[in-house]
């Protein structure tokens, strides 16, 4: 009596098995069902199981209970699908071993013959169905996998242009943990050389822009010297969100620097020690790279307002530093927006001796005089230099044919082939390891020579509390340099009577770090270690944080914050 039976538990009706056992109705088996079974152990009934099908078919109450068929036969120990045309869905047996040891299959000897079954071949074979379903499922898995990979690849492609893409952070952590510092650095430059780096498309805040004389910075953040020594990927680095970059330090002749390994990182303290020693390709080749950048800058609107400075120094075996500096200025001076004199690197023997007041005064005056001569003598109209410059550019980009208009524009702008179309400013980079008397003497020299600005500071050699840097020589930069640099900025800001602009460098990792430097007296900031430890998102994040802090502390613009620490005290 069907009404007395629980609708969930029914046996398979024989007549319906016969009616659906045809090969041409395979599509009808895409129906759903629940399967339950319980093993019935008996001495006389080995290898038999009681199959219970949970049926939700709307026709179940119309079936005669006398036609229910329970003839099952145990065939093998493989897990299979069990199909029923009476059910509305299908399900794979998850743990068949707890119910039956083998799957169910129709026993044709119990079915007998009928109009619907002519021979054994006409009976639907469960093994055949299982194999087909397995193939279909594998195809579906492949399609789903390919669809997932395609969607993720499409997402990654568009997000790869975002400096804050999360995969960059994962890759950065891997590099910091397993790859040598200089190899990581070279890999970054290689990506930048072929324009594979992301770029910042956000608009810089008008309240965070600043200037140093005729240098207008669209935001106060740039890249310090030493990151792109040879100017191979200036545009790619600037597009990360920086307003300026300082290439170099360059020397008249190329040199390999000190022995490797020479760059070591301490992730825990976010500090770097390096003993590179002015490794660069030489002034001539760097000049070629800078000329090519200036060409791209004229064609790319994203780069039209970005500043490029050049740090210059002396070769390791040079006795008179002034000769090397003059050579570099004559070669690259007309393409630079500012010239930074590096007399403070700890990795070139005897270089820091040039910070002595008398020597420093002579160096600054010689450099300023040489820059003035570039304008007075009209060097770009000198035939020999003009031809020489054309030969340099011809090596890479057929300069004479395609860029004649560029040369004409340069002549119309006093031959300064740079962003400002004016002669470059002169900055000097100082070491933090100076006593108070030396700092005061240097401040007097800077005021006397009317220098355009000072970069504070270079790396320090007076940090010895980092365990991983024990027995390693070189200059330390990063978070350990932050407080030393900030204190140095405060002192020089007061010693120069707030008259000489300051470019802050050393230990800047966040907007708060940058604002501390600015309130101490800095006009703009340079980043290096931040790029190493924070990656490509450095500029985007630090600009956002600084804008928020300026608003939070009630500054109308960044210029109001410069030196505010001194007015508060």
UniProtKB/Swiss-Prot annotation:
The chain crosses the membrane at residues 143-163. GO terms for cellular component: mitochondrial inner membrane. InterPro entries: Aldolase_TIM, DHO_dehydrogenase, Dihydroorotate_DH_2, Dihydroorotate_DH_cat, Dihydroorotate_DH_CS. GO terms for biological process: 'de novo' pyrimidine nucleobase biosynthetic process; 'de novo' UMP biosynthetic process; pyrimidine ribonucleotide biosynthetic process. Its cofactor is FMN. Keywords: Flavoprotein, FMN, Membrane, Mitochondrion, Mitochondrion inner membrane, Oxidoreductase, Pyrimidine biosynthesis, Transit peptide, Transmembrane, Transmembrane helix. Substrate binds at residues 229, 274-278, 342, 347, 458-459. GO terms for molecular function: dihydroorotate dehydrogenase (quinone) activity; dihydroorotate dehydrogenase activity. FMN binds at residues 225-229, 249, 342, 429, 477-478, 505-507, 528-529. Its EC number is 1.3.5.2. It is found in: Mitochondrion inner membrane. It is an enzyme of class 1 (oxidoreductase). Catalyzes the conversion of dihydroorotate to orotate with quinone as electron acceptor. Monomer. This is Dihydroorotate dehydrogenase (quinone), mitochondrial.
């Amino acid at each position: 009596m069907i009404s007395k039976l629980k609708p969930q538990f029914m046996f398979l009706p024989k007549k319906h098995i016969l009616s659906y056992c045809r090969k041409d109705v395979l599509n009808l088996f895409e129906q759903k069902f629940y399967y339950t079974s319980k093993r019935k152990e008996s001495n006389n009934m080995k290898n038999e199981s009681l199959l219970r099908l949970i049926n939700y078919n709307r026709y179940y109450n119309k079936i005669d209970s006398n036609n229910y068929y329970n003839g099952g036969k145990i065939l093998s120990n493989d897990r299979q699908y069990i199909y029923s045309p009476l059910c509305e869905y299908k399900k794979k047996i998850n743990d068949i071993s707890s119910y039956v040891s083998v799957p169910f299959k129709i026993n044709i000897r119990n079915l007998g013959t009928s109009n619907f079954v002519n021979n054994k071949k006409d009976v639907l074979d469960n093994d055949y169905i299982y194999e087909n379903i397995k193939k279909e499922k594998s195809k579906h898995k492949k399609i789903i996998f390919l669809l997932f990979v395609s969607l993720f690849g499409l997402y990654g492609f568009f997000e790869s242009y975002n400096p804050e893409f999360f995969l960059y952070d994962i890759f950065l952590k891997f590099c910091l943990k397993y790859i040598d510092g200089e190899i990581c650095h070279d890999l970054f430059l290689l990506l930048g050389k072929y324009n594979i780096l992301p770029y910042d498309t956000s608009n810089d805040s008008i309240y965070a822009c600043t200037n140093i004389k005729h240098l207008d910075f669209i935001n106060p953040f740039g890249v310090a010297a030493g990151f792109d020594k040879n100017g191979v990927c200036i545009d790619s680095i600037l597009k990360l969100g920086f307003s300026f970059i300082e290439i170099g330090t360059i020397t008249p002749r190329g040199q390999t620097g000190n022995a490797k390994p020479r760059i070591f990182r301490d992730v825990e303290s976010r500090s770097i020690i390096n003993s590179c020693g002015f490794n660069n390709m030489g002034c001539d080749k760097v000049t070629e790279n800078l000329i090519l950048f200036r060409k791209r800058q004229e064609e790319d609107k994203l780069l039209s307002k970005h500043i490029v400075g050049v740090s210059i120094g002396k070769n390791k075996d040079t006795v008179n530093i002034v000769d090397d500096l003059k050579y570099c200025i004559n070669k690259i001076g007309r393409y630079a927006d500012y010239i930074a004199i590096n007399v403070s690197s700890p990795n070139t023997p005897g270089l820091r001796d040039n910070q002595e007041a008398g020597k420093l005064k002579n160096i600054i005056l010689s450099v300023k005089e040489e820059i003035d001569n570039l304008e007075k003598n009209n060097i770009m109209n000198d035939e020999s230099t003009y031809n020489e410059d054309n030969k340099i550019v011809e090596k890479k980009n057929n300069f004479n044919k395609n860029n004649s208009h560029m040369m004409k524009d340069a002549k119309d702008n006093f031959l300064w082939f740079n962003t400002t179309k004016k002669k470059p400013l002169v900055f000097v980079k100082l070491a933090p390891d100076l006593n108070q008397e030396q700092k005061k003497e240097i401040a007097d020299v800077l005021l006397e020579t009317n220098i355009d600005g000072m970069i504070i500071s270079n790396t320090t050699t007076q940090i010895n509390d980092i365990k991983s840097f024990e027995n390693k020589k070189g200059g330390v930069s990063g978070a350990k340099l932050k407080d030393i640099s900030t204190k140095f900025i405060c002192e020089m800001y007061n010693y120069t009577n707030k008259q000489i602009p300051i470019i802050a460098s050393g230990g800047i990792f966040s907007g708060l770090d940058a604002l501390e430097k600015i309130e101490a007296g800095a006009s703009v900031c340079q980043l290096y270690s931040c790029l190493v430890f924070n990656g490509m998102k450095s500029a985007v994040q630090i600009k956002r944080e600084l804008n928020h802090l300026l608003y939070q502390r009630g500054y109308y613009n960044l210029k109001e914050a410069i030196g505010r620490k001194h007015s508060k005290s």
